[in-house]
Amino acid sequence: ARCDGSSLLIDCGEGTQEALKEKGWSPKPIDVICFTHYHADHISGLPGLLLTMGNAERTEPVTLIGPKGLERVVNALRTIAPELPFQLKFIELEENRHQFHIGPYVIDAYRVNHNVACYGYSISIPRAGRFDVERAKAQNVPMKAWSRLQKGETLELDGVTYTPDMVLGPDRKGLKVTYCTDTRPVPVIAEYAEHADL
């Protein structure tokens, strides 16, 4: 997924960099990598990807999400990529369901049925409501604040606090992608796939 200059990747097999190259996408803006499980075809491309991101002068932290044991598995793989110019943040999943808000993404992780700990993911990108000029005028919101409020910022002008909900209409339908792999059929998949765009 890509949104507002940020990218999210699910799994990182050995062909990941080639697939990114074919799409013309740089790995540098990948801020989040979600792992379904730790079989080699889902994680063996990580050391090379991290090195490529470092060589592209990335300095911002990268968040890694996956089943319990993530940090141990990644550190074992990093013996060939020990020095990185950015921090790795680890989120290890232990419960059956988790939800995270990272950057523009709402990430739902849910346990599926594989022969090792394995999770599926639903990635949602919420979409704010449209700017409502009449609503802004009715609440005496200064025009100089409109642009920042429309971008989701809260601000204070002349001792008055203005919030985005003062000028935005109801939330619009965002985008939802649900992904699961290597699992036996379980009801939770249909639950998270409901209303997904993909």
Language-model-derived ranges and their functions:
Residues R72-T79, F90-E95:
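A gly/proline- and charged-residue-enriched helix-loop-helix capping module
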Residues E18, S44-P47, R72-N75, Y119, ...:
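Alpha-helical elements of the RecA-like P-loop NTPase motor core of helicases
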Residues H39, G69, R184:
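Catalytic metal-binding/acid-base residues of hydrolase active sites
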Residues E94-L198:
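Metal-dependent phosphodiesterase/nuclease catalytic metal-binding core
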Residues A1-W25, P61, Y121-I123, P170-C180, ...:
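Conserved beta-strand hairpin/beta-sheet module of binuclear metal-dependent hydrolase folds
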Residues I65-E71:
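Hydrophobic/aromatic-rich structural module bridging two neighboring secondary-structure elements via a short loop
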Residues E14-I65, Q87-E94:
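Active-site metal-binding motif and surrounding structural segment of the metallo-beta-lactamase
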Residues E60, E83-K89, I102-G103, G174-L175:
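A short helix-to-beta-strand connector/capping loop
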